[in-house]
């Protein structure tokens, strides 16, 4: 199987269909549930789907070490590659790692403007963010102002 088939058969296609084409640049989506129900797994699958489409992804984690998130990407990619008999899996994996940035922020010191400042610094350094995943941010920290800041950044940067 080639990478395009992974894109075509991704569960993200069902999400896109259910949401009339999925998120577009400048839009944000919020996924919430109780702790331990698989949000990170879903977000990593969304991230992998974007990476398979040669998009640059920044995964911001608030509740785990960066290596934990990297392990999620590794495990899900490995399982997909095995189940789908992905040709050139090591080349695809190397390409994914090059296009992915994982950042870790402290939940207690959360500031949307601090995260956005970091994303802008990455862009100034040549690391464009096509897709932004924010994982583990407690819902009481994501107030209307913070959500508006992220939406404004997404629109300005052309980020999903």
Regions found by a protein language model. Give the residues of each.
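Charged, amphipathic alpha-helical linker segments immediately N-terminal to NTP-binding catalytic cores
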Residues: 1-3
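The conserved Walker
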Residues: 35
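Pre-Walker A adenine-sensing motif
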Residues: 9-22
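Phosphate-binding/switch loop-helix module in NTP-utilizing enzymes
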Residues: 100-159
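Conserved catalytic network of the ASCE P-loop NTPase/AAA+ motor domain
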Residues: 21-23, 49-52, 94-97, 123-127, ...
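Conserved glycine(s) of the Walker
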Residues: 38
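Conserved P-loop
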Residues: 41-107
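Pre-Walker A (Motif I) flank of P-loop NTPase domains
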Residues: 24-29, 55
């Amino acid at each position: 199987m080639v990478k395009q088939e992974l894109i075509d058969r991704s569960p993200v296609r069902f999400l896109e269909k259910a949401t009339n084409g999925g998120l577009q640049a400048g839009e944000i989506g919020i996924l919430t549930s109780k702790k331990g129900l698989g949000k990170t797994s879903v977000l990593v699958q969304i991230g992998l789907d974007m990476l398979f489409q040669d998009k640059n992804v920044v995964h911001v984690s608030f509740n785990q070490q960066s290596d934990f998130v990297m392990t999620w990407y590794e495990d899900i990619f490995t399982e997909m590659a095995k189940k789908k008999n992905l040709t050139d899996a090591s080349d695809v994996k190397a390409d994914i790692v090059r296009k992915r940035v994982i950042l870790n922020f402290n939940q207690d010191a959360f500031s949307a403007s601090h995260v956005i400042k970091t994303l802008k610094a990455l862009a100034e350094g040549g690391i464009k963010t096509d897709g932004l995943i924010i994982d583990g941010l407690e819902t009481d920290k994501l107030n209307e102002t913070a959500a508006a800041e992220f939406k404004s950044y997404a629109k300005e940067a052309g980020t999903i």
